[in-house]
Amino acid sequence: MGLDARFLHTNTAVHGDLGIVGKQDLVLLLSKGGNTVETVLLAQYLRERGTLTWLLTFTEYCKCAEVVDESLILHLDNEGDEWDIMPNNSTSVYLILLQGLAVEIGRRMGITLDDFRINHPGGGIGAKLRGETIWK
């Protein structure tokens, strides 16, 4: 798409990887409970750097929400496992939400199909954008 996005793990972030984050960036923190010590600390470090932070969580009142710029509280009735504890359905909700956000950001940035074609020449999508078929 032409949209710069990176994955930053909480543990590696505080051991040197914070250098990839600048003041112009937006960091989306994903935390089901919002109270994990390393996530709260990362949010505090990002705030000190002047980086815009958003929290996506399933917990209305949490420590991380007190430190970030914006919070989006999501709802989930059940994780889908027999004990309702494994991050199963919540990770799917995150994926759907983040994919939708990426599409909307691309739209607002004015990314065109030609831009997408240039930035995604490989695989089935690249072939389709060139009007080719891989398998018949």
Features from the language model and the residues they span:
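Glycine-rich phosphate-binding loops that contact phosphosugars or nucleotide phosphates
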Residues: M1-M109
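Internal, active-site/partner-interface "lid" segment
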Residues: E66, G80-D81, G106-K136
